[in-house]
Amino acid sequence: MAFALPSSLVSVCNKSFIKPSSLTPSTLRFHKLSFIDQSLSNMYIPCAFFYPKVQQRLEDSKNSDELSHIAHLLQTSLSQTLVSYYPYAGKLKDNATVDCNDMGAEFLSVRIKCSMSEILDHPHASLAESIVLPKDLPWANNCEGGNLLVVQVSKFDCGGIAISVCFSHKIGDGCSLLNFLNDWSSVTRDRTTTTLVPSPRFVGDSVFSTQKYGSLITPQILSDLNQCVQKRLIFPTDKLDALRAKVAEESGVKNPTRAEVVSALLFKCATKASSSMLPSKLVHFLNIRTMIKPRLPRNAIGNLSSIFSIEATNMQDMELPTLVRNLRKEVEVAYKKDQVEQNELILEVVESMREGKLPFENMDGYKNVYTCSNLCKYPYYTVDFGWGRPERVCLGNGPSKNAFFLKDYKAGQGVEARVMLHKQQMSEFERNEELLEFIA
């Protein structure tokens, strides 16, 4: 299959807007965005799920057009789910408010003229996978009035399907997305059960109010896809265990986590591949739902995050045991902080505003700032719409460089990393011998 012309493989069969199955009460018409929500650009979080074996679930149908039946099934369950996730059926009124007007979510049905294996086995799979995401949409700046949720179901010639979701980052983070996907897939599986009602808790501005710092203007992050590339790396369980054991022995850190050792290794290798190595910084995003008092439930919807970071100013700082030791120290410090009053992410946003910069842009003169989003232990591979677990879960190729995304590899204890770097840096990064030792 020639990947050079992916658009020729795609034909859009249907485009519609899915409204909530019941009207949103007037008391919930306006959803207030928090300070962290407002600090984010209007980009989507794009992800896709590949299901190679999809069987007809509409027993009473004899129509041969399976795509239309799959789409109808997903549209019906999405409509029911949007009753609880009503802000995603609305539109941005401004950078502080979502108008929950039941405008609906956009839904696309697409045919792809190749087999799923041609995409999953493609030598540049992280690029090929984007064929199942809405064209030109992933990571795009969603202007005010645009759709806050876009879904695409793609059917391959082999009979498999992919379900992709572009989920507004303005309203929720990766944990929020997983809550939505679990609820939507549960409603789809149990469509005969009318008592299954999702119960997300929209936090809004109740935790991070704008009263202290004032409202924000929407930041614009310009996409740099022409210069940045994504690489998919698999750290299998046996090699990851060996890496963890090696780091534990050399660092003195007890039971280093998968995320600690993998992010440290990626940071080290990416920094070495950079033309301007040091000083460099690694910023980890941190889910603070369980760190806030009183604790927030797992089904809390919003951007509920903070950050912690480590720095490397000389070559000794770049040794793997040192990096992991510093990561463990900083995360322990983060857990002792009041994540409302001492939230490092908010402090970074405020400081950036004062200097007229974007967050993490040239932080304190560092040559390179890398960010890491750790989704390990977030069970994306258990999202089951009725066709079993997905063969692969992917993230759309990102708009900017120097980003690491970590998640579980399928249902095991391995790690799948999505690394986004500048093209020239990536060519050096992927040849690093220490990295090659621990990936599949």
UniProtKB/Swiss-Prot annotation:
Reactions catalysed according to its record: vanillylamine + (6E)-8-methylnon-6-enoyl-CoA = capsaicin + CoA + H(+); (6E)-8-methylnon-6-enoyl-CoA + 4-hydroxy-3-methoxy-benzenemethanol = capsiate + CoA
Protein induction: Induced by wounding and heat.
Pfam families: Transferase
InterPro entries per UniProt: CAT-like_dom_sf
Gene Ontology biological process terms, A to Z: alkaloid biosynthetic process
Free-text tissue specificity from the UniProt record: Expressed in fruit 20 days post anthesis. Confined to the placenta of green fruits at high levels. Barely detectable in the pericarp and seeds as well as in the placenta of mature fruits.
Documented EC number(s): 2.3.2.35
Organism superkingdom: Eukaryota
Gene3D superfamilies in UniProt: Chloramphenicol acetyltransferase-like domain (3.30.559.10)
Family membership noted in the UniProt record: Belongs to the plant acyltransferase family.
The protein, known as: Acyltransferase Pun1
